[in-house]
Amino acid sequence: MSQQVIIFDTTLRDGEQALQASLSVKEKLQIALALERMGVDVMEVGFPVSSPGDFESVQTIARQVKNSRVCALARCVEKDIDVAAESLKVADAFRIHTFIATSPMHIATKLRSTLDEVIERAIYMVKRARNYTDDVEFSCEDAGRTPIDDLARVVEAAINAGAKTINIPDTVGYTMPFEFGGIISGLYERVPNIDKAIISVHTHDDLGLGVGNALAAVHAGARQVEGAMNGIGERAGNCSLEEVIMAIKVRQDILNVHTRINHQEIWRTSQLVSQICNMPIPANKAIVGSGAFAHSSGIHQDGVLKNRENYEIMTPESIGLNQIQLNLTSRSGRAAVKHRMDEMGYKESEYNLDNLYDAFLKLADKKGQVFDYDLEALAFINKQQEEPEHFRLDYFSVQSGSNDIATASVKLACGDDIKAEAANGNGPVDAIYQAINRITDYNIELVKYSLSAKGHGKDALGQVDIVANYNGRRFHGVGLATDIVESSAKAMVHVLNNIWRAAEVEKELQRKAQNKENNKETV
Protein backbone atom coordinates (compact mmCIF):
# COMPACT_ATOMS: atom_id res chain seq x y z
CA MET A 1 0.00 0.00 0.00
CA SER A 2 1.41 3.39 -0.99
CA GLN A 3 2.06 6.13 1.57
CA GLN A 4 0.95 9.74 1.27
CA VAL A 5 3.44 12.49 0.56
CA ILE A 6 2.33 15.74 2.18
CA ILE A 7 2.43 18.69 -0.22
CA PHE A 8 3.64 21.88 1.48
CA ASP A 9 3.23 24.96 -0.70
CA THR A 10 5.39 28.03 -0.09
CA THR A 11 4.39 30.09 -3.14
CA LEU A 12 3.13 32.91 -0.92
CA ARG A 13 6.23 32.99 1.30
CA ASP A 14 9.40 31.79 -0.40
CA GLY A 15 7.90 32.23 -3.87
CA GLU A 16 6.84 35.83 -3.27
CA GLN A 17 10.39 36.81 -2.33
CA ALA A 18 11.32 36.62 -6.02
CA LEU A 19 8.67 39.08 -7.21
CA GLN A 20 9.46 42.58 -8.39
CA ALA A 21 6.33 43.92 -6.70
CA SER A 22 4.73 42.72 -3.48
CA LEU A 23 1.31 41.11 -3.71
CA SER A 24 -1.70 42.72 -2.09
CA VAL A 25 -3.67 40.92 0.61
CA LYS A 26 -6.44 40.30 -1.92
CA GLU A 27 -4.04 38.80 -4.46
CA LYS A 28 -2.49 36.53 -1.84
CA LEU A 29 -5.92 35.36 -0.73
CA GLN A 30 -6.89 34.63 -4.34
CA ILE A 31 -3.82 32.40 -4.73
CA ALA A 32 -4.40 30.77 -1.33
CA LEU A 33 -7.98 29.82 -2.24
CA ALA A 34 -6.74 28.33 -5.53
CA LEU A 35 -4.13 26.28 -3.65
CA GLU A 36 -6.82 25.10 -1.25
CA ARG A 37 -8.98 24.06 -4.19
CA MET A 38 -6.02 22.19 -5.68
CA GLY A 39 -5.70 20.29 -2.41
CA VAL A 40 -2.34 21.28 -0.92
CA ASP A 41 -2.01 19.88 2.60
CA VAL A 42 -0.11 22.83 4.08
CA MET A 43 0.40 26.35 2.76
CA GLU A 44 3.07 28.65 4.15
CA VAL A 45 1.64 32.10 3.53
CA GLY A 46 4.04 34.59 5.06
CA PHE A 47 6.60 35.77 7.57
CA PRO A 48 4.35 37.78 9.94
CA VAL A 49 7.05 39.52 11.95
CA SER A 50 8.57 41.04 8.79
CA SER A 51 5.88 43.69 8.24
CA PRO A 52 2.32 44.71 9.22
CA GLY A 53 1.25 43.86 5.66
CA ASP A 54 2.56 40.31 5.93
CA PHE A 55 0.88 39.92 9.32
CA GLU A 56 -2.46 41.01 7.84
CA SER A 57 -2.07 38.66 4.86
CA VAL A 58 -1.38 35.66 7.10
CA GLN A 59 -4.29 36.54 9.37
CA THR A 60 -6.71 37.03 6.46
CA ILE A 61 -5.77 33.71 4.83
CA ALA A 62 -5.83 31.85 8.17
CA ARG A 63 -9.36 33.12 8.72
CA GLN A 64 -10.69 32.03 5.31
CA VAL A 65 -8.83 28.83 4.34
CA LYS A 66 -10.46 25.77 5.93
CA ASN A 67 -9.31 22.68 4.03
CA SER A 68 -5.54 23.23 4.07
CA ARG A 69 -3.35 23.79 7.13
CA VAL A 70 -2.11 27.41 7.17
CA CYS A 71 1.49 27.94 8.26
CA ALA A 72 3.66 30.97 9.06
CA LEU A 73 7.43 31.23 9.16
CA ALA A 74 9.44 32.33 12.20
CA ARG A 75 13.13 32.45 12.97
CA CYS A 76 14.29 30.86 16.23
CA VAL A 77 13.51 34.18 17.90
CA GLU A 78 10.91 34.66 20.63
CA LYS A 79 9.21 37.64 18.98
CA ASP A 80 9.00 35.85 15.62
CA ILE A 81 7.22 32.87 17.15
CA ASP A 82 4.87 34.99 19.27
CA VAL A 83 3.88 37.18 16.31
CA ALA A 84 3.39 34.14 14.06
CA ALA A 85 1.05 32.60 16.65
CA GLU A 86 -0.86 35.87 16.99
CA SER A 87 -1.42 36.07 13.22
CA LEU A 88 -2.57 32.44 13.01
CA LYS A 89 -4.80 32.16 16.07
CA VAL A 90 -7.95 32.97 14.04
CA ALA A 91 -7.59 29.52 12.38
CA ASP A 92 -9.07 26.36 13.87
CA ALA A 93 -5.65 24.69 13.55
CA PHE A 94 -2.34 26.02 12.29
CA ARG A 95 1.38 25.32 11.95
CA ILE A 96 4.36 27.36 13.09
CA HIS A 97 7.50 26.78 11.03
CA THR A 98 10.68 27.86 12.81
CA PHE A 99 14.24 27.56 11.56
CA ILE A 100 17.90 28.13 12.35
CA ALA A 101 21.09 27.56 10.36
CA THR A 102 23.07 24.38 11.07
CA SER A 103 25.96 24.34 8.58
CA PRO A 104 29.46 25.19 9.88
CA MET A 105 29.69 28.14 7.49
CA HIS A 106 26.38 29.68 8.58
CA ILE A 107 27.00 29.03 12.27
CA ALA A 108 30.48 30.59 12.17
CA THR A 109 29.97 33.53 9.80
CA LYS A 110 26.27 34.38 10.01
CA LEU A 111 25.26 33.41 13.54
CA ARG A 112 28.75 33.72 15.10
CA SER A 113 27.78 30.88 17.37
CA THR A 114 28.49 27.19 18.02
CA LEU A 115 26.59 24.01 17.18
CA ASP A 116 25.82 23.42 20.87
CA GLU A 117 24.33 26.92 21.18
CA VAL A 118 22.29 26.37 18.01
CA ILE A 119 20.87 23.12 19.41
CA GLU A 120 20.04 24.80 22.72
CA ARG A 121 18.27 27.64 20.91
CA ALA A 122 16.37 25.24 18.65
CA ILE A 123 15.09 23.25 21.64
CA TYR A 124 13.92 26.38 23.45
CA MET A 125 12.14 27.83 20.42
CA VAL A 126 10.42 24.58 19.40
CA LYS A 127 9.10 24.30 22.95
CA ARG A 128 7.94 27.91 22.83
CA ALA A 129 6.08 27.27 19.57
CA ARG A 130 4.50 24.16 21.10
CA ASN A 131 2.87 26.44 23.70
CA TYR A 132 0.71 27.75 20.84
CA THR A 133 0.11 24.66 18.69
CA ASP A 134 0.82 20.93 18.50
CA ASP A 135 1.83 21.37 14.85
CA VAL A 136 5.40 22.68 14.88
CA GLU A 137 7.84 22.30 12.00
CA PHE A 138 11.56 22.81 12.49
CA SER A 139 14.01 23.48 9.66
CA CYS A 140 17.79 23.05 9.64
CA GLU A 141 18.78 25.89 7.32
CA ASP A 142 21.56 24.90 4.89
CA ALA A 143 21.17 21.25 5.86
CA GLY A 144 22.64 20.28 2.49
CA ARG A 145 26.05 21.57 3.64
CA THR A 146 25.78 20.33 7.24
CA PRO A 147 27.87 17.27 8.25
CA ILE A 148 25.50 14.34 8.69
CA ASP A 149 26.42 13.67 12.33
CA ASP A 150 25.86 17.34 13.25
CA LEU A 151 22.56 17.30 11.38
CA ALA A 152 21.46 14.14 13.19
CA ARG A 153 22.16 15.78 16.58
CA VAL A 154 20.02 18.81 15.72
CA VAL A 155 17.18 16.69 14.33
CA GLU A 156 17.08 14.40 17.37
CA ALA A 157 17.01 17.38 19.74
CA ALA A 158 14.24 19.16 17.80
CA ILE A 159 12.07 16.03 17.79
CA ASN A 160 12.58 15.57 21.53
CA ALA A 161 11.54 19.21 22.01
CA GLY A 162 8.23 18.54 20.26
CA ALA A 163 8.67 19.21 16.53
CA LYS A 164 6.26 17.04 14.53
CA THR A 165 7.86 17.81 11.15
CA ILE A 166 11.59 18.08 10.51
CA ASN A 167 12.49 19.91 7.33
CA ILE A 168 15.81 19.28 5.56
CA PRO A 169 16.47 22.17 3.15
CA ASP A 170 19.00 22.28 0.37
CA THR A 171 18.99 26.03 0.89
CA VAL A 172 21.41 26.98 -1.87
CA GLY A 173 20.62 24.17 -4.33
CA TYR A 174 24.07 22.64 -3.88
CA THR A 175 23.55 18.89 -3.56
CA MET A 176 23.21 16.18 -6.19
CA PRO A 177 20.11 13.92 -6.10
CA PHE A 178 22.08 10.81 -5.07
CA GLU A 179 23.80 12.92 -2.40
CA PHE A 180 20.59 14.46 -1.06
CA GLY A 181 18.83 11.09 -0.97
CA GLY A 182 21.83 9.84 1.01
CA ILE A 183 21.34 12.61 3.58
CA ILE A 184 17.75 11.46 4.19
CA SER A 185 18.83 7.81 4.42
CA GLY A 186 21.63 8.83 6.77
CA LEU A 187 19.20 10.55 9.12
CA TYR A 188 16.97 7.47 9.24
CA GLU A 189 20.05 5.44 10.21
CA ARG A 190 21.37 7.87 12.85
CA VAL A 191 18.36 9.50 14.57
CA PRO A 192 16.80 7.10 17.11
CA ASN A 193 13.51 9.04 17.50
CA ILE A 194 13.01 9.80 13.81
CA ASP A 195 9.81 7.72 13.73
CA LYS A 196 8.15 10.41 15.88
CA ALA A 197 8.32 13.05 13.11
CA ILE A 198 7.62 13.46 9.42
CA ILE A 199 10.76 14.16 7.39
CA SER A 200 10.29 17.01 4.94
CA VAL A 201 12.52 18.46 2.21
CA HIS A 202 12.82 21.96 0.78
CA THR A 203 14.99 22.10 -2.33
CA HIS A 204 16.19 24.98 -4.50
CA ASP A 205 16.97 25.03 -8.19
CA ASP A 206 20.35 26.79 -8.40
CA LEU A 207 21.81 23.83 -10.33
CA GLY A 208 18.47 22.86 -11.89
CA LEU A 209 18.14 19.91 -9.49
CA GLY A 210 15.32 21.01 -7.18
CA VAL A 211 12.77 18.47 -8.41
CA GLY A 212 15.36 15.70 -8.78
CA ASN A 213 16.57 16.23 -5.22
CA ALA A 214 13.00 16.24 -3.86
CA LEU A 215 12.16 12.97 -5.62
CA ALA A 216 15.42 11.36 -4.47
CA ALA A 217 14.47 12.35 -0.91
CA VAL A 218 10.98 10.86 -1.30
CA HIS A 219 12.55 7.64 -2.57
CA ALA A 220 14.75 7.64 0.55
CA GLY A 221 11.80 8.09 2.92
CA ALA A 222 10.87 11.79 3.08
CA ARG A 223 7.11 12.19 3.35
CA GLN A 224 6.67 15.94 2.88
CA VAL A 225 7.84 18.01 -0.09
CA GLU A 226 8.00 21.79 0.02
CA GLY A 227 7.95 23.90 -3.12
CA ALA A 228 6.20 26.61 -5.08
CA MET A 229 3.89 26.65 -8.07
CA ASN A 230 5.81 27.19 -11.32
CA GLY A 231 9.01 26.87 -9.28
CA ILE A 232 9.08 30.58 -8.38
CA GLY A 233 11.38 31.64 -5.57
CA GLU A 234 14.66 33.29 -4.67
CA ARG A 235 17.52 33.19 -7.15
CA ALA A 236 16.83 30.30 -9.57
CA GLY A 237 13.65 29.37 -7.72
CA ASN A 238 12.18 26.61 -5.61
CA CYS A 239 11.35 23.02 -6.38
CA SER A 240 8.43 23.17 -8.83
CA LEU A 241 5.44 21.66 -7.04
CA GLU A 242 3.45 20.72 -10.12
CA GLU A 243 6.45 18.78 -11.46
CA VAL A 244 6.90 16.83 -8.22
CA ILE A 245 3.17 16.13 -7.99
CA MET A 246 2.90 14.80 -11.54
CA ALA A 247 6.16 12.83 -11.24
CA ILE A 248 4.69 11.08 -8.19
CA LYS A 249 1.47 10.38 -10.10
CA VAL A 250 3.12 9.17 -13.31
CA ARG A 251 5.86 7.11 -11.58
CA GLN A 252 3.84 5.70 -8.70
CA ASP A 253 5.07 2.30 -9.85
CA ILE A 254 8.60 3.04 -8.65
CA LEU A 255 8.01 5.59 -5.86
CA ASN A 256 5.05 3.77 -4.28
CA VAL A 257 3.64 7.01 -2.83
CA HIS A 258 0.72 9.30 -3.64
CA THR A 259 -0.60 12.80 -2.89
CA ARG A 260 -4.12 14.05 -2.21
CA ILE A 261 -3.82 16.75 -4.88
CA ASN A 262 -6.71 17.40 -7.26
CA HIS A 263 -4.62 17.14 -10.42
CA GLN A 264 -7.30 18.73 -12.60
CA GLU A 265 -6.68 22.04 -10.80
CA ILE A 266 -2.96 22.18 -11.59
CA TRP A 267 -3.21 24.03 -14.90
CA ARG A 268 -5.60 26.72 -13.64
CA THR A 269 -3.66 27.28 -10.42
CA SER A 270 -0.41 27.56 -12.36
CA GLN A 271 -1.90 30.12 -14.75
CA LEU A 272 -3.36 32.15 -11.88
CA VAL A 273 -0.02 32.29 -10.06
CA SER A 274 1.70 33.31 -13.30
CA GLN A 275 -0.76 36.13 -13.95
CA ILE A 276 -0.99 37.52 -10.43
CA CYS A 277 2.77 37.30 -9.85
CA ASN A 278 3.54 38.72 -13.31
CA MET A 279 5.91 35.84 -14.05
CA PRO A 280 5.28 34.32 -17.50
CA ILE A 281 5.64 30.56 -17.84
CA PRO A 282 8.28 29.47 -20.40
CA ALA A 283 6.73 27.60 -23.33
CA ASN A 284 8.98 24.58 -22.68
CA LYS A 285 8.24 24.45 -18.94
CA ALA A 286 7.48 20.88 -17.86
CA ILE A 287 3.80 20.10 -17.13
CA VAL A 288 2.36 23.63 -17.54
CA GLY A 289 4.30 25.22 -20.43
CA SER A 290 2.28 26.00 -23.56
CA GLY A 291 4.43 23.51 -25.50
CA ALA A 292 4.37 20.74 -22.89
CA PHE A 293 1.88 18.70 -24.94
CA ALA A 294 2.81 19.97 -28.42
CA HIS A 295 4.11 17.58 -31.08
CA SER A 296 5.83 19.13 -34.11
CA SER A 297 7.83 16.21 -35.50
CA GLY A 298 6.01 14.33 -38.24
CA ILE A 299 6.99 10.99 -36.74
CA HIS A 300 5.70 12.05 -33.33
CA GLN A 301 2.46 13.46 -34.77
CA ASP A 302 1.83 10.20 -36.61
CA GLY A 303 2.53 8.20 -33.46
CA VAL A 304 0.22 10.34 -31.30
CA LEU A 305 -2.61 10.09 -33.83
CA LYS A 306 -2.31 6.29 -33.72
CA ASN A 307 -2.02 6.12 -29.93
CA ARG A 308 -1.43 9.11 -27.64
CA GLU A 309 0.60 6.96 -25.25
CA ASN A 310 3.28 6.57 -27.92
CA TYR A 311 4.60 10.03 -27.03
CA GLU A 312 2.49 11.24 -24.08
CA ILE A 313 3.20 9.89 -20.60
CA MET A 314 0.29 11.96 -19.26
CA THR A 315 -2.59 13.80 -20.89
CA PRO A 316 -3.40 17.52 -20.93
CA GLU A 317 -6.73 16.63 -19.34
CA SER A 318 -4.92 15.06 -16.37
CA ILE A 319 -3.78 18.54 -15.26
CA GLY A 320 -7.07 20.23 -16.17
CA LEU A 321 -6.03 21.57 -19.58
CA ASN A 322 -9.05 21.38 -21.85
CA GLN A 323 -7.80 21.58 -25.43
CA ILE A 324 -11.29 21.78 -26.91
CA GLN A 325 -12.08 25.50 -27.21
CA LEU A 326 -15.75 26.44 -27.56
CA ASN A 327 -16.80 29.87 -28.79
CA LEU A 328 -19.59 32.23 -27.76
CA THR A 329 -20.96 35.26 -29.63
CA SER A 330 -22.75 38.50 -28.75
CA ARG A 331 -26.01 36.54 -29.11
CA SER A 332 -25.01 34.24 -26.24
CA GLY A 333 -26.92 34.98 -23.06
CA ARG A 334 -25.79 35.24 -19.45
CA ALA A 335 -26.81 31.63 -18.87
CA ALA A 336 -24.50 30.47 -21.68
CA VAL A 337 -21.57 32.41 -20.24
CA LYS A 338 -22.23 31.03 -16.75
CA HIS A 339 -22.58 27.49 -18.13
CA ARG A 340 -19.23 27.78 -19.90
CA MET A 341 -17.56 29.10 -16.74
CA ASP A 342 -19.05 26.16 -14.82
CA GLU A 343 -17.66 23.73 -17.41
CA MET A 344 -14.21 25.29 -17.06
CA GLY A 345 -14.35 24.69 -13.30
CA TYR A 346 -15.04 28.20 -12.03
CA LYS A 347 -17.27 28.71 -9.01
CA GLU A 348 -19.68 31.65 -8.86
CA SER A 349 -17.71 33.06 -5.92
CA GLU A 350 -14.64 33.42 -8.16
CA TYR A 351 -16.13 36.07 -10.43
CA ASN A 352 -18.93 38.61 -10.66
CA LEU A 353 -21.29 37.38 -13.38
CA ASP A 354 -22.79 40.83 -14.06
CA ASN A 355 -19.38 42.44 -14.56
CA LEU A 356 -18.08 39.47 -16.52
CA TYR A 357 -21.08 39.44 -18.84
CA ASP A 358 -20.78 43.19 -19.50
CA ALA A 359 -17.10 42.74 -20.41
CA PHE A 360 -17.99 39.69 -22.52
CA LEU A 361 -20.56 41.63 -24.57
CA LYS A 362 -18.13 44.48 -25.26
CA LEU A 363 -15.50 41.99 -26.39
CA ALA A 364 -17.99 39.98 -28.46
CA ASP A 365 -19.07 43.15 -30.28
CA LYS A 366 -15.44 43.78 -31.24
CA LYS A 367 -14.32 40.21 -32.00
CA GLY A 368 -17.49 38.44 -33.06
CA GLN A 369 -16.47 35.20 -31.34
CA VAL A 370 -15.27 34.83 -27.74
CA PHE A 371 -13.28 31.72 -26.84
CA ASP A 372 -12.50 29.99 -23.55
CA TYR A 373 -9.14 31.73 -23.23
CA ASP A 374 -10.91 35.09 -23.68
CA LEU A 375 -13.39 34.28 -20.92
CA GLU A 376 -10.62 33.18 -18.56
CA ALA A 377 -8.68 36.38 -19.21
CA LEU A 378 -11.80 38.48 -18.59
CA ALA A 379 -12.55 36.54 -15.38
CA PHE A 380 -9.02 37.16 -14.12
CA ILE A 381 -9.22 40.92 -14.74
CA ASN A 382 -12.74 40.93 -13.32
CA LYS A 383 -11.41 39.45 -10.07
CA GLN A 384 -8.45 41.83 -9.91
CA GLN A 385 -10.61 44.92 -10.28
CA GLU A 386 -13.71 44.02 -8.27
CA GLU A 387 -12.70 46.15 -5.29
CA PRO A 388 -13.91 49.78 -5.16
CA GLU A 389 -11.74 51.93 -7.40
CA HIS A 390 -10.60 55.41 -6.45
CA PHE A 391 -9.23 55.99 -9.95
CA ARG A 392 -11.06 55.12 -13.16
CA LEU A 393 -10.12 55.69 -16.79
CA ASP A 394 -12.87 57.88 -18.23
CA TYR A 395 -11.41 58.74 -21.64
CA PHE A 396 -8.15 58.79 -23.56
CA SER A 397 -7.01 59.85 -27.02
CA VAL A 398 -3.58 59.58 -28.62
CA GLN A 399 -2.07 61.20 -31.68
CA SER A 400 1.13 59.58 -32.91
CA GLY A 401 3.02 58.97 -36.12
CA SER A 402 6.45 58.05 -37.48
CA ASN A 403 7.52 61.71 -37.69
CA ASP A 404 5.27 63.16 -34.98
CA ILE A 405 5.73 63.51 -31.24
CA ALA A 406 3.13 61.37 -29.50
CA THR A 407 0.49 63.41 -27.66
CA ALA A 408 -2.10 61.97 -25.29
CA SER A 409 -5.21 63.45 -23.71
CA VAL A 410 -6.52 61.63 -20.64
CA LYS A 411 -9.58 62.04 -18.44
CA LEU A 412 -9.38 60.28 -15.10
CA ALA A 413 -12.04 59.86 -12.45
CA CYS A 414 -10.36 60.55 -9.09
CA GLY A 415 -12.91 59.79 -6.41
CA ASP A 416 -15.84 62.10 -7.17
CA ASP A 417 -13.81 64.39 -9.44
CA ILE A 418 -13.00 64.16 -13.14
CA LYS A 419 -9.57 65.52 -14.05
CA ALA A 420 -8.05 65.94 -17.49
CA GLU A 421 -4.52 66.50 -18.74
CA ALA A 422 -2.51 66.26 -21.94
CA ALA A 423 1.15 65.38 -22.36
CA ASN A 424 3.79 64.46 -24.90
CA GLY A 425 5.83 61.31 -24.66
CA ASN A 426 8.20 58.90 -26.34
CA GLY A 427 5.42 56.97 -28.05
CA PRO A 428 1.70 56.64 -27.28
CA VAL A 429 2.06 54.61 -24.07
CA ASP A 430 4.62 56.97 -22.55
CA ALA A 431 2.45 59.96 -23.49
CA ILE A 432 -0.53 58.44 -21.65
CA TYR A 433 1.61 57.70 -18.60
CA GLN A 434 2.98 61.25 -18.56
CA ALA A 435 -0.57 62.64 -18.68
CA ILE A 436 -1.65 60.34 -15.82
CA ASN A 437 1.35 61.47 -13.75
CA ARG A 438 0.31 65.08 -14.29
CA ILE A 439 -3.24 64.34 -13.12
CA THR A 440 -2.25 62.44 -9.99
CA ASP A 441 1.09 64.12 -9.19
CA TYR A 442 2.26 60.65 -8.11
CA ASN A 443 5.48 60.74 -10.16
CA ILE A 444 5.40 57.01 -10.87
CA GLU A 445 8.49 55.40 -12.40
CA LEU A 446 7.88 52.53 -14.83
CA VAL A 447 10.21 49.61 -14.01
CA LYS A 448 8.89 46.83 -16.23
CA TYR A 449 6.43 46.60 -19.13
CA SER A 450 5.32 43.36 -20.78
CA LEU A 451 2.65 42.46 -23.31
CA SER A 452 1.13 39.04 -23.91
CA ALA A 453 -1.60 37.87 -26.26
CA LYS A 454 -4.53 36.05 -24.68
CA GLY A 455 -5.65 33.97 -27.62
CA HIS A 456 -4.81 33.90 -31.31
CA GLY A 457 -5.15 36.16 -34.32
CA LYS A 458 -5.15 39.91 -34.87
CA ASP A 459 -8.21 40.44 -32.66
CA ALA A 460 -6.74 38.61 -29.65
CA LEU A 461 -6.95 40.28 -26.27
CA GLY A 462 -3.70 41.93 -25.28
CA GLN A 463 -2.73 41.81 -21.61
CA VAL A 464 -0.29 44.42 -20.38
CA ASP A 465 1.56 43.83 -17.11
CA ILE A 466 3.60 46.62 -15.59
CA VAL A 467 5.69 47.08 -12.48
CA ALA A 468 6.00 50.66 -11.25
CA ASN A 469 8.05 52.28 -8.51
CA TYR A 470 6.41 54.76 -6.13
CA ASN A 471 8.03 56.10 -2.96
CA GLY A 472 10.47 53.18 -2.80
CA ARG A 473 7.78 50.50 -3.19
CA ARG A 474 6.94 48.52 -6.29
CA PHE A 475 3.39 47.95 -7.49
CA HIS A 476 2.00 45.62 -10.14
CA GLY A 477 -0.75 46.59 -12.57
CA VAL A 478 -2.55 44.68 -15.29
CA GLY A 479 -4.80 45.80 -18.14
CA LEU A 480 -6.74 43.88 -20.79
CA ALA A 481 -8.22 45.04 -24.10
CA THR A 482 -8.05 44.31 -27.81
CA ASP A 483 -6.20 47.65 -28.16
CA ILE A 484 -2.77 47.45 -26.52
CA VAL A 485 -2.67 51.21 -25.87
CA GLU A 486 -5.93 50.90 -23.95
CA SER A 487 -4.51 47.87 -22.09
CA SER A 488 -1.48 49.96 -21.17
CA ALA A 489 -3.64 52.79 -19.84
CA LYS A 490 -5.76 50.37 -17.79
CA ALA A 491 -2.63 48.75 -16.34
CA MET A 492 -1.39 52.11 -15.06
CA VAL A 493 -4.80 52.92 -13.56
CA HIS A 494 -4.65 49.52 -11.82
CA VAL A 495 -1.28 50.57 -10.36
CA LEU A 496 -2.80 53.85 -9.16
CA ASN A 497 -5.59 51.98 -7.37
CA ASN A 498 -3.10 49.58 -5.79
CA ILE A 499 -1.06 52.54 -4.50
CA TRP A 500 -4.19 54.18 -3.13
CA ARG A 501 -5.37 50.95 -1.44
CA ALA A 502 -1.92 50.37 0.09
CA ALA A 503 -2.04 53.87 1.57
CA GLU A 504 -5.52 53.21 2.98
CA VAL A 505 -4.37 49.91 4.51
CA GLU A 506 -1.38 51.66 6.07
CA LYS A 507 -3.66 54.30 7.57
CA GLU A 508 -5.93 51.60 9.01
CA LEU A 509 -2.99 49.69 10.50
CA GLN A 510 -1.66 52.88 12.07
CA ARG A 511 -5.11 53.63 13.48
CA LYS A 512 -5.34 50.15 15.01
CA ALA A 513 -1.84 50.45 16.47
CA GLN A 514 -2.71 53.83 17.97
CA ASN A 515 -5.94 52.49 19.46
CA LYS A 516 -4.01 49.56 20.95
CA GLU A 517 -1.49 51.96 22.47
CA ASN A 518 -4.27 54.17 23.85
CA ASN A 519 -5.95 51.13 25.43
CA LYS A 520 -2.66 50.19 27.14
CA GLU A 521 -2.35 53.70 28.58
CA THR A 522 -5.95 53.54 29.83
CA VAL A 523 -5.30 50.24 31.61
Curated annotation (Swiss-Prot):
It comes from the Bacteria. Residues 392-523 are annotated as: Regulatory domain. GO terms for cellular component: cytosol. The keyword Cell division does not apply. Pathway: Amino-acid biosynthesis; L-leucine biosynthesis; L-leucine from 3-methyl-2-oxobutanoate: step 1/4. Keywords: Amino-acid biosynthesis, Branched-chain amino acid biosynthesis, Cytoplasm, Leucine biosynthesis, Manganese, Metal-binding, Transferase. Homodimer. Belongs to the alpha-IPM synthase/homocitrate synthase family. LeuA type 1 subfamily. Catalyzes the condensation of the acetyl group of acetyl-CoA with 3-methyl-2-oxobutanoate (2-ketoisovalerate) to form 3-carboxy-3-hydroxy-4-methylpentanoate (2-isopropylmalate). PANTHER family: 2-ISOPROPYLMALATE SYNTHASE 1, CHLOROPLASTIC-RELATED (PTHR10277:SF9), HOMOCITRATE SYNTHASE-RELATED (PTHR10277). NCBIfam families: leuA_bact (TIGR00973), PRK00915.1-1 (NF002084), PRK00915.1-3 (NF002086). This is 2-isopropylmalate synthase.
